[in-house]
Amino acid sequence: MNPDALSDLVLLAACAASAWWVAVGRAAWRGAMLLLGLAAAIGVLRYSGLEWALGPHRFFSVLAACAAFWLMAVALRWPQAPLASQATAVGRFVVLLGGLGIAASQVGAAWWAQVVPGLSALVLAWTMVQQRSALGLLGSVALVASFVVAALAAPDVQLLGMFNRTQALHYLLALAVLLLGQVRLQPAPTAGKPAA
């Protein structure tokens, strides 16, 4: 197995573990892990040399970029929202926002698949700052770092002398989902009652 395929396999395992650890009521988180995991599973095939997997890997990567990261943000920022807790709402969201992202990428607005994850990463980071979650903040930093690597690193550059851009993206995403998946949800403070 080559290093790119191995990095996607690590991401797949991280998504599966994070989805497994999450309680039943967090449908948005599990949906996000499913989308990222599907992209990673097909990526393992792609980077293992199966040419037919290139198209499906690109498709699921764009779908995950447009929907999975917002689902992660919703799961941690608004845990009581129907989108965070209901699988049917997650399915509709993936079809609508993911479909919009796929369509946008096909008509030349490929930036959409970069802006949506970036905004969701900022929402996640702000949420972790507000919740004072050290694990969540580290996970948010790893998530933002993965986007920075994907957007700015040249494909042939070795990062830290060990990883190419693809591998760094996958390992940072794996770290992010493992850390963010461990965040304990705090209920939003109710109006009229001071927070304890």
Regions found by a protein language model. Give the residues of each.
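Membrane-interface helix caps and helix-loop-helix hairpins in membrane proteins
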Residues: 49-55, 101-113, 156-163
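Aromatic-anchored segments of alpha-helical transmembrane domains
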Residues: 37-45, 93-105, 142-155
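Membrane-proximal helix-loop-helix units in multi-pass membrane proteins
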Residues: 58-128
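Hydrophobic cores of alpha-helical transmembrane segments in multi-pass inner/ER membrane proteins
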Residues: 8-20, 63-79, 119-126, 170-187
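C-terminal transmembrane-bundle signature of multipass membrane proteins
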Residues: 130-196
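Membrane-interfacial loop-to-transmembrane alpha-helix junctions, especially the N-terminal start
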Residues: 24-36, 81-93, 132-143, 190-196
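Hydrophobic core segments of alpha-helical transmembrane domains in multi-pass membrane proteins
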Residues: 32-36, 113-123, 138-144, 167-173
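N-terminal topogenic module of multi-pass integral membrane proteins
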Residues: 1-55, 183-196
